[in-house]
């Protein structure tokens, strides 16, 4: 039953139906394409896009994650995941997906292909996070952020505590720490959570 040629035919048929606005029809075509070639991540990201149009966001997220499982280097899967999470108003998680997309894109063969689109997504996520927080006090932001176990863990990490203390007296020090990928990911998480203010 596996047949990459048939899979591509169905995927193209799905794309045509999608452009015509027949999203349920495109979901069926993409589903057939996935059955014919489950190792091609494009079927999943295409179907995720159609599900998003149908407001079936949990299904769309599942497909975006499945595309990432099939091919962890497929940048468009992370872009799709970011868009789905944004639609779900999960702005912090959407921001993380966009950051992962950016990292994978810049490491990809042939150089970065999607940086403009990804930069747009990063800005969109940050603006949404700022808007969400604009009517919160610092205490409320901290309280909300600390409900995320990952944020709480970072805040209790002695290395991060000393970096944050250092950054209060010398903000430029953060830039140096950003060169370390492990620390950078933690700093980005705190920025996204609103604990580190960038404006």
What do the predicted segments below correspond to?
Residues 1-199:
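Alpha-helical tetratricopeptide repeat
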């Amino acid at each position: 039953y596996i047949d990459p040629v048939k899979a591509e035919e169905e995927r193209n048929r799905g794309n045509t139906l999608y452009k015509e606005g027949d999203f349920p029809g495109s979901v069926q075509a993409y589903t057939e394409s996935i059955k014919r070639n489950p190792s091609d991540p494009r079927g999943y990201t295409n179907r995720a896009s159609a599900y998003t149009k149908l407001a079936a966001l949990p299904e769309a997220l599942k497909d975006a994650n499945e595309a990432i499982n099939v091919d962890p280097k497929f940048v468009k899967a992370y872009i799709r995941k970011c868009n789905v999470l944004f639609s779900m108003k999960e702005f912090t998680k959407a921001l993380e997906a966009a950051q992962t997309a950016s990292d994978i894109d810049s490491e990809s063969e042939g150089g970065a292909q999607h940086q403009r689109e990804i930069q747009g997504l990063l800005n969109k996520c940050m603006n949404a996070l700022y808007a969400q927080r604009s009517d919160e006090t610092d205490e409320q932001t901290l309280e909300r952020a600390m409900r995320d176990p990952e944020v709480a863990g970072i805040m209790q990490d002695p290395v991060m505590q000393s970096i944050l203390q250092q950054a209060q007296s010398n903000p430029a020090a953060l830039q140096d720490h950003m060169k370390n990928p492990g620390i950078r990911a933690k700093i980005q998480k705190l920025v996204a959570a609103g604990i580190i203010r960038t404006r």
